[in-house]
């Protein structure tokens, strides 16, 4: 593990000399997508042991890494557990950001983050200034893993007990928690059905909605809420995001309810 971390750190330092922040973010995502594509093409990634076409693997890896949610195959039925594991790892890395995870690994092994690397992190997190980016990066990982673990545990127990899925339900719970928190839009229910077969499952839907909302408001807002509990002390950005999210969520609910109320 230490060897891989050192290798990754040296590789990023080499790229630092020739790429600016935006180019660095784009390049690392391109490499993530390429690696994901190759893994999804392996016979062990599909349920029937066949190799996925490169164009389909590339599309799937791009969709998962960029948390888009578009599919060209039935995720629940086409992929094996290895393929589903590759997908959720791509979703997690894409949701957190490669530079964020690189920062975590560097800090974990005691490596110092220089100014240029801080600028890259600033670019990847869409921040206005480089100050505090290392602290925020570490908090990003902490927030994500904590929230995903809490809701993943709830969903795992729900799948295990209420839906009687056994041990498979535990894996499903954490898989869907990560997917929902990263706003990826992927699911394992199969038949391209998403949650339509569970529209009356209150626990499942409330957890998914909460994860989508919390993940959607962004890590900078979550960090601001943690440090400033009072509305007046929040940053303008946080106030705008929270207000807009509330208006769109509840306003959209009322509009859809009014338009679809008589629809059977």
Q: What are the residue ranges of the model-derived segments?
A:
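Membrane-proximal intracellular helices of multi-pass ion channels
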Residues: 1-264
